[in-house]
Curated annotation (Swiss-Prot):
Keywords: Methyltransferase, S-adenosyl-L-methionine, Transferase, tRNA processing. Coiled coil: none annotated. CDD domains: AdoMet_MTases. The gene is trmA. The active site is at C324, E358. Its EC number is 2.1.1.-, 2.1.1.35. This is tRNA/tmRNA (uracil-C(5))-methyltransferase. One of its GO terms (biological process) is tRNA methylation. Belongs to the class I-like SAM-binding methyltransferase superfamily. RNA M5U methyltransferase family. TrmA subfamily.
Length: 366
């Protein structure tokens, strides 16, 4: 393996603040035409903020090691510590690799390792292989699970071996109340738990005195749904992923949220249902006419809202928009501000030391 140059990433308070200020300068420049109110800024911990990550595995002289690949020449370099990873990830990394290297059946053709951890100190490790997994592997992985006190999943082509659970439980504090979430292996979860808590608290505050009913699109595992539900009479949420819908229903029961209904459908399909263009069997148990929606909450993928969903949002008095891509947010705001005004704007440093910045916007009808 080529010997990489010594990586001397700076995770000091000064370095963190410098990178954040650069992102905020760019954000203000990009949104200058909207005459934004003062931006509320929510900072991340400087280290140990990332709750999930994955590493490729490099094999050399009978030893496996974690590697990443240089962005310049694509060469692998070993990862011996991971300061942005959670403390639990950093604890597990050397312990796991030491045990893997002691057992040929665990090490042989191991291709990738994925970590999922929580603030409640739970952990799930997925081991991905380029070989079929057999009874010998199951026996060794079962011992590994007990020694590390983690959940273990084995994956290879057309094969998934679940030893016990395929999820962990995360506990997030939102304005003084604790919410528990099932986080399933392979499904989307917010990577920065401390910033996620701030995002949930912010969204809850924006809707505290709104009342009426809430429509949420792209609800995922109910991440925002559960804290928001206490501010509304009823909540109707949509999500396309079956795994996420199942988790959202599980999480609503776990947190005793009883004013929520979930429909498994895309935002485009829901728009057709609202307009009476199509009828959906998945909505047979829901009477849309019974809802008195005051607010729509959207947390779309990086592509942002499609034009039809943008126009759907304009029908609501209040729009709460969480964006993981300021570029598509800017495009959507060109449409939304034709009928609504921006009341509050927030920046969440979900991904420190990258150019990414998460945003939150509250818009109200003019």
């Amino acid at each position: 393996m080529p010997q990489p140059q010594q990586h001397t990433a700076d995770y000091s308070s000064a370095a963190y603040e410098a990178q954040l200020q650069q992102k905020l300068i760019r954000l203000n420049q990009d949104f200058a035409s909207f005459n934004l109110p003062e931006i509320s800024v929510f900072r991340s911990p400087e280290k140990h903020f990332r709750m999930r990550t994955e590493f490729r595995i490099w094999h050399e002289r009978g030893t496996a090691m974690y590697v990443m690949f240089s962005q310049t020449d694509k060469r692998p370099y070993p990862i011996r510590e991971f300061p942005i990873g959670s403390e639990r990830i950093n604890q597990l990394m050397p312990e796991l690799m030491a045990l893997v290297n002691r057992h040929e059946c665990l090490r042989h053709k191991l291709f990738q390792v994925e970590f999922l951890t929580s603030l409640s100190n739970q952990a799930l490790i997925t081991l991905v292989y380029h070989k079929p997994l057999d009874e010998e592997w199951i026996s060794a992985a079962t011992d590994l699970r007990k020694q590390l006190n983690v959940e273990i999943i084995g994956r290879s082509r057309k094969q998934k071996i679940l030893l016990e659970r395929d999820h962990i439980i995360e506990c997030l504090k939102v304005n003084g109340r604790e919410y528990r979430y099932q986080q399933v292996e392979g499904s989307f979860t917010q990577p920065n738990a401390r910033v996620c808590e701030q995002m949930l608290s912010w969204a809850q505050e924006q809707t505290r005195h709104t009342g009426g009913d809430l429509l949420e699109l792209y609800c995922g595992n109910g991440n925002f749904t559960l804290p928001l539900a206490q501010n509304f009479d009823r909540v109707l949420a949509t999500e396309i992923s079956k795994t996420s819908v199942d988790s959202a229903l599980y999480n609503s029961r776990l947190n005793q949220v009883e004013n929520l209904q979930i429909a498994r459908m895309s935002s485009e399909e829901f728009t057709q249902a609202m307009d009476g263009v199509r009828e959906f069997n998945r909505l047979k148990h829901i009477s849309l006419n019974d809802y008195r929606f005051s607010t729509i909450f959207v947390d779309p993928p990086r592509a942002g809202l499609d034009p039809a969903t943008c126009h759907l949002a304009q029908r609501f008095d209040n729009i709460v928009y969480i964006s993981c891509n300021p570029e598509t947010l800017k495009d959507n705001l060109q449409t939304l501000t034709q009928t609504h005004q921006i009341c509050t704007f927030a920046a969440f440093d979900q991904f420190p030391y990258t150019h990414h910045l998460e945003c939150g916007v509250l818009l109200q009808r003019r």
